[in-house]
Amino acid sequence: MELNPANRAGDSSSIISFDKSTVVVLVAISLILVETFSGALRFYFDKAGISPLLYLPKVACILLFALELRTFKAGRLFWTFVIVWAVSGLIAMLHRASPHNLAFSLFALSPLVFGLVCSEHLIHRRKILCWAIGFCLLASLAGVALDKLTAVPWKGYSYNVGETELSANTTWSADDVDRVAGFARVSNVLSILIAFYTLYLFMFLRSRLVMMLLSAVALYAIVLTTSKAPAGAFALTMGLLMIQRMSWTCRILCVLVVFIGLLLPTLGMVMSFDALTVSSSGSSLASLYDRLINTWPNVINALIREGWVLTGAGFGMVGSTMGIFPVEGSEIFLGMDNSALYLWAMLGVVGGLLYTLQIPLLFKLIEDESRVGRMLLSISVCWCLISWTTDMFEVAVANLFAGLAIGYVITAKQEAMTSRPADLHLTALPNLR
């Protein structure tokens, strides 16, 4: 079963449609390039006094989202969440957020909504996107080697935009080992980029040997960044690809992956962990224990204290917007280290339900036997696994691929619904003529 063959729309597309697809894919490529070389570009653009130009791809994402939303065909569930999204923004305003907070949150999530409404164009132009992603993967691997073997000038560099100090590249270490970020801003972002770029390129590879070699190189590079969650997620995703034809096994695993991500932050509230023992032993699980003991319980307690468990803090009160436009008393919502908790802190119970909607999304992609479907399935599973300990909505490229997967499934569902009446043909019986 093929959910949404991208070539179908492209075969009969007009010149205008062709131009729109080209613009969309160029915006996506510009976003991917900026995120891949973010650390280096911020350093050199700041030196040249043109650092604001780095934000143009996300601005273009917002503009294309607004243009495509007018004609985007989606079901009631999508529009219900759009309304909930708007109401959540009003709730955030009641919780002392400013319009700047809402605007910056929309800016941060712009790749997701852009990928969602423009998914058909991105799938149609996937070969052009493939060349860009292939280049960015090679650059990311080269960046790992460069950062590991030399001293790059943008390492630890900070700069100012207006009165706000921003980091071009975060320098830090884990267990006295430098966390390699390459050309990117942060090591964990680099590892996510390598994982997603590799999984995307699998769609175009025919040789299993080449796929195995590429996955081995990618996994080694991710390990060099010392990012544990992306390394484990990528390895598990590769295992899932080997059993993807066992549909019911894949379904069960997907349900487990989603519910573990949803319930993991609550584990520290019901169980006791000895942080001192783990920290003193230098265990690789020390960061996870820190989240279980400090980060996640503190966020949950803050939601309970403020009475925001059901409604959430609101759209504009969670994530990096708290660092740029802080709201007094809400600084704890700057980072969750878990995407399910991120959504819950933002939207309340609705956020939790939104996170569980990954299950039907993954089920639809499991049913899809096309190369596009398999690619989006692997990226979506990897996305969900990394989200256990990462705020994935703060990673632009992760947002782009999440929007692409959601838009792909929504578009396929709408096409299936509109094509059903055409499948019904009534013919008169010969004896009744």
Residue spans of the language-model regions?
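N-terminal signal-anchor transmembrane segment
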Residues: 2-70, 86-92, 383-385, 400, ...
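Hydrophobic transmembrane alpha-helices and their immediate junctions
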Residues: 22, 208-209, 242, 250-252, ...
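Long extracytoplasmic/lumenal interhelical loops at the membrane interface
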Residues: 37-47, 273-347
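Helix-loop-helix junctions and helix-breaking kinks within/between transmembrane helices
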Residues: 41-51, 91-106, 185-188, 210-244, ...
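Transmembrane alpha-helices of multi-pass inner-membrane enzymes
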Residues: 62, 376-387, 391-433
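Aromatic-anchored transmembrane helix interface
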Residues: 80-86, 96-120, 128-132, 137
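Alpha-helical transmembrane segments of multi-pass inner-membrane proteins
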Residues: 130-155, 174-176, 181-225, 231-244
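A membrane-periplasm/extracellular boundary helix in multi-pass inner-membrane enzymes
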Residues: 142-151, 245-284, 301-305
